[in-house]
Design a protein with these regions (language model features):
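N-terminal amphipathic alpha-helix/helix-capping segment at the start of soluble metabolic enzymes
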Residues: 1-26, 119, 282
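Active-site mouth loops of central-metabolism enzymes
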Residues: 18-36, 55, 74-82, 138-151, ...
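Hydrophobic faces of well-ordered beta-strands that scaffold small-molecule active sites
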Residues: 21-27, 52-54, 76-80, 98-100, ...
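Glycine-rich, proline-tolerant flexible connector loops at the mouths of alpha/beta enzymes
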Residues: 34, 45-69, 99-107, 169-178
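Alpha-helix-loop-beta-strand connector modules within alpha/beta enzyme cores
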Residues: 59-80, 113-125, 185-196, 280-284
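Glycine-enriched alpha-helix->loop->beta-strand junction motifs that scaffold or abut catalytic
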Residues: 71-74, 92-98, 119-122, 189-195, ...
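Hydrophobic or amphipathic alpha-helical targeting/insertion segments
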Residues: 85-126
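Catalytic alpha/beta core domains of metabolic enzymes, predominantly
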Residues: 129-133, 138-285
Length: 348
């Protein structure tokens, strides 16, 4: 059962409570390239991104935040480190959320300046704890970025904001070690009702990043923990969005768009099952229907598994049995089984 947290409004998206899990990504174009950032932001929006983060190293870079915000219709988050004036500048241009670690932007007066700016414009702050950049005194206490150290860091930063009567807060507590990350989120969720941004940081190359994020993010969602997610990949941010939705779909959350399932095939397969499944998935890109499509390799397990889908085929030599809503309908034969199958899918 999902652990319900307080609601936080980020632009036109609300997270927490019973609201859907929001999928995020972050632009990776150099901040000086405003045109490139705008173009990438539009691609992310088209891919289904619901919350978009953009780095802002200095106050002067707020012009990139402003340009991106004016170009898309999804909330923009400014990623701030060290320079509190960058946070103030982003608040001035109407950013929808600010991600900081209050402990690394200076003394209490600077933290209060950021809090006051966000308070005046109802801008939430995400406290983004990372296992690779914990405070020295916390690392000295625990010796490593163990879950307890990460939770202590997060709560330390929360108290800094709460000291100034600010509670429009989201928290993340990321680590590249999946078991540590998961235990940290468990411990944090048990002691706070602020909504949680879930992710695995520095997850590695594309393939390993997918695996670690699937395990870490998916595992947390299955335990009811998480209000928004970001899949960190060494890839284009659109791929992160796609992966985020696939994780949500895999753990049972309703996601607009088709899900294509297929068997791994074996020596019994007598038709190009894998090629057909890949082509079906390609042709259905952009489809918003929430349907499950099965492409199965043979008549052993295929019919039973295809029956679990909205529509599916179980193949044999030069033919495939078509199933619709669990019932066998007819055989598809000839050289154009794929085209026949797509016609049936489009009828749903």
């Amino acid at each position: 059962m999902r652990q319900l947290k307080r609601e936080v409004k980020i632009g036109n998206v609300t997270i927490g409570g019973k609201n859907p899990i929001a999928v995020q990504t972050m632009l990776n174009v150099p901040v000086e390239d405003i045109e490139g950032n705008v173009a990438q932001a539009k691609r992310c929006e088209a891919a289904g991104c619901q919350i978009l983060r953009v780095t802002c190293p200095s106050a002067a870079d707020a012009k990139c935040i402003e340009a991106v915000k004016n170009a898309v219709n999804i909330p923009i988050v400014a990623d701030i480190h060290f320079d509190y004036k960058a946070a103030l500048a982003c608040a001035d241009v109407g950013v929808d959320k600010i991600r900081i670690n209050p402990g690394n932007i200076g003394d209490d007066d600077r933290v209060k300046a950021v809090v006051d700016a966000c308070q005046q414009k109802n801008i939430p702050i995400r406290i983004g704890v990372n296992g690779g950049s914990l405070e020295k005194h916390i690392l000295a206490k625990y010796g490593a970025p163990v879950p307890e150290a990460m939770v202590e860091s997060a709560l330390y930063h929360v108290r800094l904001l709460e000291k100034f009567d600010f509670n429009n807060i989201v928290i993340s507590i990321k680590n590249s070690n999946v078991p540590r990350m998961m235990e940290a989120y468990r411990q944090l969720s048990a002691v706070t009702d602020y909504p949680l941004h879930v992710g695995v940081t520095e997850a590695g190359t594309y393939q390993m990043g997918l695996l670690k994020s699937g395990m870490g993010i998916g595992g947390m969602l299955l335990e009811g923990i998480g209000d928004t997610i970001r899949v960190s990949l060494a890839a284009d941010p659109e791929k992160e969005v796609e992966a985020g939705y696939n994780i949500l779909r895999a753990v049972g959350f309703p996601v607009a768009g088709p899900e294509v399932i297929t068997c791994p095939t074996c020596g019994r397969t007598q038709y190009p099952c894998t090629e057909i499944a890949n082509e079906v998935e390609r042709r259905l890109q952009g489809c918003k229907k929430s349907i499950k499509v099965a492409v199965m390799g043979c008549v052993v397990n295929g019919p039973g598994e295809a029956r679990e889908a909205d529509i599916g085929i179980a193949g044999g030599k030069s033919e495939a049995v078509l199933f619709v809503h669990g019932e066998p309908v007819r055989k598809l034969t000839g050289e154009n089984i794929l085209d026949q199958f797509m016609e049936e899918i489009y009828k749903l």
